């Protein structure tokens, strides 16, 4: 944050009383001519320090110049991304008299005048170009009593609070080492700019300038004593160690059952299992409830298991209900290609456990979308019949609230009304919409 003496001289020249007769556009051109983007943060830190010290920056036009430059350096970025946005929030946020007294003793920003507040609020909104054609001296003399300007900075304050919450606790408890004099000189000797510039140079230049120092809690731990203390804890080292190897008798013992189950499971992902293999696999899963986590089933392999062995997939999903990955398994299941086996798995799961409604709704939407997009008429008719039977089962068993999908399902039935099952589903929807109870087990004709 340190500045070279030449850079500080250029900055103080832009901030001088004489420069306050130049327009804001001219001040901006002079500033960007002297300082590059890499120097903006260091220059901004010096400007904030000057704003905190009324005896170094006493006049309103100079403060207006400082506020304008803090905004101008980061005007192309969002306001919350400006590292000095907290300065704007502090100056625009009104404080009580007691808080103002506390701030003057804590090195915070002193209050600003109404024209300064008006100018700052214009910067935070969409400032008109005519405003930058004025000079700081003209803005400081504006009469704004007839045009009060209030803006909502709650969004900015929230963003600043989130940024501050990420800081270390020690940093949040620190404050600058440069404090304003609470009892300024009352000799009325006037402001001497040369003296103020010398003081500013001593504060911000040099290898370790006071601007970079601050006060914060230091957690200093005492050095442990070199001599033995009374009642000191003694560390005992055995003088005659006796090491005995503790053998794990079960280690390296071949587990034939586990190997066989993994072999069957690997086959289940590729082809249907025989009845004997299914019985053996499900029997071992019943004996050891944790076996399901160690035989190779992952969310990515679930579609292969569903297509080749839907009954095994159902039993394994039921045993994985307490797993932290069950949401991933459900997501893969409802997004896989629609088929008779996937419908069978979803239907059995809905009757066995309470699936999240959003997963069921997503699966129904995917089924309807698949039926609408398929080109083969024979396959389309077959899938539509499957979907209609599946939906009737869900509705009659009261697993879904049909009102949540009424419009989508009704449009599906109308589109495929030529198919008998779709017409039956449509009549069931109308029956429910009229408040009637559908007859259990009634077959649509």
Curated annotation (Swiss-Prot):
GO BP terms: regulation of translation; regulatory ncRNA-mediated gene silencing
Keywords, alphabetical: Cytoplasm, Nucleus, RNA-mediated gene silencing, Transcription, Transcription regulation, Translation regulation
Keyword S-adenosyl-L-methionine: no
InterPro entries attached to this UniProt entry: CNOT11 (IPR019312)
Entry annotated with the keyword Nucleus: yes
One GO cellular component term noted in the UniProt record for this chain: nucleus
Coiled-coil ranges (or none): none
Bias (Low complexity) ranges: 174-193
Any Pfam family the entry gives: CNOT11
Localisation per UniProt entry: Cytoplasm; Nucleus
Residue numbers spanned by region Disordered: 169-193
PANTHER family listed in its UniProt record: CCR4-NOT TRANSCRIPTION COMPLEX SUBUNIT 11
Subunit structure: Component of the CCR4-NOT complex. cnot10 and cnot11 form a subcomplex docked to the cnot1 scaffold.
Similarity annotation: Belongs to the CNOT11 family.
Function comment: Component of the CCR4-NOT complex which is one of the major cellular mRNA deadenylases and is linked to various cellular processes including bulk mRNA degradation, miRNA-mediated repression, translational repression during translational initiation and general transcription regulation. Additional complex functions may be a consequence of its influence on mRNA expression. Is required for the association of cnot10 with the CCR4-NOT complex. Seems not to be required for complex deadenylase function.
Protein name, per record: CCR4-NOT transcription complex subunit 11
């Amino acid at each position: 944050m340190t500045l070279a003496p030449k850079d500080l001289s250029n900055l103080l020249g832009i901030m001088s009383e004489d420069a306050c007769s130049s327009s804001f556009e001219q001040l901006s051109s002079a500033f960007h001519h002297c300082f590059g983007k890499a120097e903006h943060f260091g220059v901004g830190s010096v400007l904030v320090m000057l704003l905190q010290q009324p005896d170094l920056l006493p006049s309103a036009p100079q403060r207006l110049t400082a506020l304008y430059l803090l905004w101008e350096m980061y005007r192309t970025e969002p306001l919350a991304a400006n590292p000095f946005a907290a300065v704007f929030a502090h100056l625009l946020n009104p404080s009580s008299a007691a808080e103002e007294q506390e701030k003057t003793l804590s090195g915070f920003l002193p209050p600003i005048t109404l024209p300064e507040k008006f100018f700052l609020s214009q910067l935070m909104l969409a400032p008109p170009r005519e405003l930058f054609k004025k000079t700081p001296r003209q803005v400081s003399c504006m009469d704004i009593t007839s045009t009060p300007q209030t803006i909502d900075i709650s969004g900015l304050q929230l963003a600043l609070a989130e940024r501050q919450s990420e800081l270390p606790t020690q940093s949040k408890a620190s404050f600058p080492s440069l404090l304003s004099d609470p009892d300024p000189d009352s000799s009325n000797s006037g402001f001497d700019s040369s003296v103020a510039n010398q003081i500013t140079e001593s504060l911000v230049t040099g290898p370790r300038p006071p601007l970079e120092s601050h006060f914060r809690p230091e957690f200093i731990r005492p050095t442990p004593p070199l001599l033995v203390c009374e009642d000191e804890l003694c560390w005992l080292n055995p003088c005659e160690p006796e090491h005995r190897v503790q053998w794990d008798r079960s280690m390296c013992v071949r587990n034939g059952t586990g190997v066989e189950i993994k072999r069957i499971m690997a086959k289940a992902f590729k082809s249907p299992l025989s009845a004997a293999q299914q019985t053996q696999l499900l029997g071992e899963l019943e004996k050891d409830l944790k076996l399901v986590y160690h035989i190779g089933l992952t969310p990515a392999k679930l579609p292969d298991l569903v297509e080749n062995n839907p009954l095994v997939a159902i039993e394994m999903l039921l045993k994985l209900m307490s797993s932290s990955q069950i949401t991933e398994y459900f997501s893969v299941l409802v997004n896989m290609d629609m088929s008779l086996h996937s419908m069978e798995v979803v239907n059995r799961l809905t009757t066995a456990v309470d699936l999240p409604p959003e997963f069921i709704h997503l699966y129904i939407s995917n089924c309807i979308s698949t039926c609408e997009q398929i080109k083969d008429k024979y396959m389309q008719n077959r899938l539509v019949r499957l979907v209609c039977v599946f939906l009737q089962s869900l509705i009659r068993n009261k697993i879904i609230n049909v009102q949540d999908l009424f419009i989508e399902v009704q449009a599906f039935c109308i589109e495929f009304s030529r198919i008998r099952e779709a017409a039956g589903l449509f009549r069931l929807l109308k029956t429910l919409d009229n408040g009637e109870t559908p007859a259990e087990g009634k077959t649509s004709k």
